[in-house]
Amino acid sequence: MSQKYLFIDRDGTLISEPPSDFQVDRFDKLAFEPGVIPQLLKLQKAGYKLVMITNQDGLGTQSFPQADFDGPHNLMMQIFTSQGVQFDEVLICPHLPADECDCRKPKVKLVERYLAEQAMDRANSYVIGDRATDIQLAENMGINGLRYDRETLNWPMIGEQLTRRDRYAHVVRNTKETQIDVQVWLDREGGSKINTGVGFFDHMLDQIATHGGFRMEINVKGDLYIDDHHTVEDTGLALGEALKIALGDKRGICRFGFVLPMDECLARCALDISGRPHLEYKAEFTYQRVGDLSTEMIEHFFRSLSYTMGVTLHLKTKGKNDHHRVESLFKAFGRTLRQAIRVEGDTLPSSKGVL
């Protein structure tokens, strides 16, 4: 799996930049930007690796002696380390603009190895800095740029933005039998739109979204002139795939869910977002259809969904009325899914380190 990186400017971003001479060359000039340490810890927990990259004009010359730089810089690094903040690398350009070197930001000389290794997740890596040159560096690297500012984009805002993404997925599945378009928003509620051509199935899918606490849009064109088999099966496959993609790296999710709702029907549902697809299903129905949905396809739907989502799912229901029995399964699954996808922290809920 490719690695997420944050390439972070030093002066004006990690620590304050003195407006008088733009040099942190005395201990009394060293001051950390508000909230930087707790947010860097949060970002590390979210899977980011940190790289410091900084232009230090004339470092090592008479105007900026190396010893004057080293004292405050080493103290800064000691403080970061003592609090658990670890930088994989510190990259420094010591040249003046007039030197026309190859390593001064926004040129990419200092970060060439990250670009060459192909191990960097470019879509989810960022340059963070307070100057236009930092944003230009991001563009030159082909990654995202965040312009740090104490008022408009400070460290708490950056931490929130990079660890609380909108968990969204869009899946299109086209076969000779069906054309399916599924969108899911795990962190938004309400406004679901579902049209599979099977009215009762639409109602059941809406139960998943409503009780799962998320929004989805599903549009299906299937070979219903034959029967509902391909429509229900392929919808399960596409929805399971969309849920898996929207969950992303699964950091911070509860992972497990269990509900036992009791009404006219007793339904049990247990779920583990384990990466291991498996279904245990027990339900009996009096009739072959409820509305326009074949009751035998209900198990097939959940089996298809659990396969592409990569979950272990146990479902069981008892009751007298077929409509209520079917509905209890979908409601129970929705409530269980709501528990399992809820984000409560930043760690991956697995001792293996992968889900």
UniProtKB/Swiss-Prot annotation:
Activity regulation as described: Inhibited by Ca(2+).
Positions of region (Imidazoleglycerol-phosphate dehydratase): 167-355
Region (Histidinol-phosphatase): 1-166
Effect recorded for E17A: Severe decrease in histidinol-phosphate phosphatase activity in presence of low magnesium concentration. At higher magnesium concentration (5mM), no effect on activity
Reaction catalyzed: D-erythro-1-(imidazol-4-yl)glycerol 3-phosphate = 3-(imidazol-4-yl)-2-oxopropyl phosphate + H2O; L-histidinol phosphate + H2O = L-histidinol + phosphate
Sequence positions that bind Mg(2+): D9, D11, D130
Active-site residues, as the UniProt record annotates them: D9 (nucleophile), D11 (proton donor)
Protein name as it appears in the record: Histidine biosynthesis bifunctional protein HisB
Bound cofactor: record note: Binds 2 Mg(2+) ions. Can also use Co(2+) and Mn(2+)ions.
The protein's annotated pathway: Amino-acid biosynthesis; L-histidine biosynthesis; L-histidine from 5-phospho-alpha-D-ribose 1-diphosphate: step 6/9; Amino-acid biosynthesis; L-histidine biosynthesis; L-histidine from 5-phospho-alpha-D-ribose 1-diphosphate: step 8/9
Cofactor(s) for this UniProt protein: Mg(2+); Zn(2+)
Organism, as annotated: Escherichia coli O157:H7
Classification via CDD domains: HAD_HisB-N, IGPD
Gene3D superfamilies: HAD superfamily/HAD-like (3.40.50.1000), Imidazole glycerol phosphate dehydratase, domain 1 (3.30.230.40)
Annotated Gene Ontology cellular component terms: cytoplasm
Family: In the N-terminal section; belongs to the histidinol-phosphatase family. In the C-terminal section; belongs to the imidazoleglycerol-phosphate dehydratase family.
GO biological process: L-histidine biosynthetic process
Entry keywords, A to Z: Amino-acid biosynthesis, Cytoplasm, Histidine biosynthesis, Hydrolase, Lyase, Magnesium, Metal-binding, Multifunctional enzyme, Zinc
Pfam families noted in UniProt: Hydrolase_like, IGPD
Upper taxonomic lineage: Bacteria, Pseudomonadati, Pseudomonadota, Gammaproteobacteria, Enterobacterales
UniProt cross-references to InterPro entries, sorted A to Z: HAD-like_sf, HAD-SF_hydro_IIIA, HAD_sf, His_synth_bifunc_HisB, HisB_N, Histidinol-phos, IGPD_sf, ImidazoleglycerolP_deHydtase
